[in-house]
Amino acid sequence: MINLRKTHPLMKIINQSFIDLPAPSNISAWWNFGSLLGACLIIQILTGFFLAMHYTSDTLTAFSSVAHICRDVNYGWLIRNLHANGASMFFMCLFLHVGRGIYYGSYLYKETWNIGVILLLTVMGTAFVGYVLPWGQMSFWGATVITNLLSAIPYIGTTLAEWIWGGFAVDKATLTRFFAFHFILPFIITALAIVHLLFLHETGSNNPSGINPDSDKIPFHPYYTIKDALGLILMFMVLLLLALFSPDLLGDPDNFSPANPLNTPPHIKPEWYFLFAYAILRSIPNKLGGVLALLASILILLIIPLLHTANQRSMMFRPVSQTLFWILAANLVTLTWIGGQPVEQPFIIIGQLASMLYFLLILVLMPLAGMFENYMLKPKW
């Protein structure tokens, strides 16, 4: 009998993607994050689906419906905690996945990289509209502050903001449409993830050395299925640890109070995974300038392939670039910390310096390091 997985039209696609796929023999645990992100997406869609069965997107009942889910729905507290902390796991994996791509030069697969950046932006948008849904204080004021940034766009800004709101402020219409966006976007993310994989499988995976691995490939199954399974178990353990023992660790206490347009919280800040971008936004005293810097902080990823000057693909054998990469990582941690601090000295100046260093590293120092390393590798005799 002819092997069904190699002949059946549907099974054939699965086989070529997850079973008989030729994979480099030396890819490390840093290559696990793709499958972990896929698992995160599935967890988020499933838990979100069950939450949507009980949630109501109305300003009068949204907050109560979330409380009802946690108190009265069977395992509702668990579903909600898994969904909220699943988002944190999603972003943790996303940041590590992007960092891996930068470190090992995976961005030179330009189509895969660009779809990945679009995926990152879409996930950020989904997380933002999702954070508004419980209709707590931070949900409401976060939505107000971020959507208000649209009004910085010259001429059409105010009209655009009111169009997004569906009125003159964040209100019932905004909440309803944000719920609709939050429901549809994960399916768009799933479609984009499939396209991301499609482009990746056109070229095959990169590997830590950055050298063409075609001469030494192994089948994806069983080698990388078992490796991915280990990663999944570890990630799921961390997620359960968070969801069961400290579900509110990464949340904001202000969100336990129902939204009140008449009472502004002392410190408006987004979830931890947006703090680095929020710090960059706040570091520029001009509204439009801040919005442009915020956009640039993410969109800069699109031009990273153009800034690659080194003769070697990976940073594995490039100590100067490695040093700058880890400075960039530390800088992002600093920005995340600053984003959660009040707007006062010394946090203002630290945030401004860290924001400046962020762009300086990516646009100037790392390309220069690549050129310097090329020069150092040239024979001098």
UniProtKB/Swiss-Prot annotation:
Assigned GO CC terms: mitochondrial inner membrane; respiratory chain complex III
Positions bound to heme b b566: H97, H196
A Pfam family: Cytochrom_B_C
MF terms (GO), sorted A to Z: metal ion binding; ubiquinol-cytochrome-c reductase activity
UniProt KW keywords: Electron transport, Heme, Iron, Membrane, Metal-binding, Mitochondrion, Mitochondrion inner membrane, Respiratory chain, Transmembrane, Transmembrane helix, Transport, Ubiquinone
Membrane topology classification: Multi-pass membrane protein
Protein name: Cytochrome b
Organism: Paramurexia rothschildi (Broad-striped dasyure)
